[in-house]
Regions:
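Disulfide-stabilized, aromatic/cysteine-rich ligand-recognition loop
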Residues: 15-18, 26-34, 61, 79-88, ...
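Short beta->alpha transition motifs characteristic of CBS
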Residues: 140-146
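Short aromatic-cysteine micro-motif
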Residues: 16-38, 62-115, 120-132
Length: 191
């Protein structure tokens, strides 16, 4: 008697489609909720100072500058993008919120479909997160992968066509993982 062996190959296909992400700027209020919930101390708070950009070319070190008082004097407004945060701070927020930072490439892929006003040409003050395109409002920290340097995306209110060209995708600006500034914030990937 012959035995017939039937081999059945089953190909499993994923039932879910690739994630459809959006990008969203983290506001002062959202960051405050994180701080209140965790007691986290930011890099700027730890150091007791941070950089405050005065214009596209000049900055100064200001004691007491942090996410609550980005210029060291005035209290942050809840609807504005959180600033004076470092990559380390952004990562801790992401862990708490269960979200991720975009890579530089993903950032530009997602912001290209936002048709709201791009802030540039030295528009001051920083605009509310809901009223403008995130490009050009504050620099956004992106996920650097294995690099020790963090590439900033999007440009800031200090950028213009005559200066840093920050709102152009091919612009390269890097900071270390502990640097904050009055015009550096972060955006997250959302589903």
């Amino acid at each position: 008697m012959k035995k017939i062996v039937l081999i059945l190959f089953i190909t499993l296909a994923s039932c879910s489609s690739p994630k459809d992400y959006n990008i969203k700027t983290v506001s002062v209020k959202e960051f405050r909720d994180f701080i209140n919930d965790t007691g986290y101390i930011t890099s700027a708070e730890e150091y007791g100072w941070s950089f405050v950009q005065e214009n596209v070319y000049d900055y100064k070190v200001v004691n007491g500058a942090n996410w609550m008082k980005p210029d060291g004097i005035n209290v942050s407004i809840d609807s504005l993008p959180v600033t004076q945060v470092s990559y380390k701070d952004a990562i801790e927020y992401c862990k708490w919120a269960g979200v991720e930072l975009p890579t530089y490439e993903k950032y530009w892929e997602l912001v290209s479909s936002d048709d709201r006003l791009i802030v540039s040409n030295n528009m001051y003050p920083i605009s509310s997160v809901k009223s403008v395109n995130i490009v050009g409002n504050v620099w956004d920290i992106t996920e650097p992968g294995n690099s020790d340097q963090v590439r900033l995306a999007g440009g800031s209110l200090f950028c213009s066509i005559d200066t840093c060209h920050g709102t152009q995708e091919d612009r390269e600006l890097y900071v270390d993982k502990e640097t904050g500034n009055i015009h550096i914030g972060f955006s997250i990937l959302t589903e």
